[in-house]
Amino acid sequence: MFTRLAPRLQPQLLSTKRVLTTRYPTLVRTPIFHQTPIQIIKRNYVIVHKERKKEPVIRYLFYMLVASWVAIYFVANRVDKKKPPKQSFTEREFQSYEEETGLKRRNKLISHHMNSKYKFYVIPYVHDEEELNRVANLLQHKDENATVKIIDPAQLIEEQKKDEGMKYHYLLEDLDEQGKPYPPGLITAVIKQEIYKILNTREGTFDTNFLIKNYPQTTNEAIKFENDISDIQKCLILHYDMLNELPKNKTDEEQRAIKNVDGYFSSVGKSKTLVEKFDPMDKEFEDIILEDI
């Protein structure tokens, strides 16, 4: 019977031998018919260990992540440095410009305990230069020991435009070329620079009453002045100019803004209306004004 099956099994045995020879050469060196039972059992229980894939260590991933963040940070900074300087500003952007360039101080320029030495009076709108001088004379008569210093913001702006060494020269030049309005706070910043210069000269050693012409013309400028420079002693309203000259020289929007300044200071008891213009002031009226200023 075995002799009959041998021819049939011979192809299968040869095929098995090839597979075993390929996969387990050490186990098929001896023909299957000549192997001992121990060799056959050993062949069936051979365990092949597959190579394990090495998984990345967590700390290496962490290092790579940190390195990526650092690279992004430096690239972003280099891009920001290449951005051209911006010269047209909103109010918030102008505040940032002041902080970046060191033009903005954290505290008021005139501290509270210096308010008696330096006093500030503002006239939101004056058309007649002669009337401005009359108000200056009233202030001088009120306090003969103090000097009166008239500040004209329009004149300061022109000085900034003419001198390339001034801090706001290029900003003002750019805004004028583009036909854009001055951002809120710019005029106050120019006034602040002028007052700072005065305080650091011999003139600043004396008691001084500052009279600021045609300023503030918006409530934002008024608030910024009191936040950055000093308290305003009195807002002087020239009744005749406000009633007759203002409509001739300002738009409706500008007129409303200037009148709102009067309302702002009236709400805190700092507004005074001067009603005399052409008629000579008698002694009684002058005394009333001096008591109230």
UniProtKB/Swiss-Prot annotation:
Subcellular location field: Mitochondrion membrane
Domain of life: Eukaryota
Residue intervals passing through the bilayer: 57-76
Name of the protein in question: Altered inheritance of mitochondria protein 36, mitochondrial
Keywords: Membrane, Mitochondrion, Transit peptide, Transmembrane, Transmembrane helix
Recorded family membership: Belongs to the AIM36 family.
Membrane topology: Single-pass membrane protein
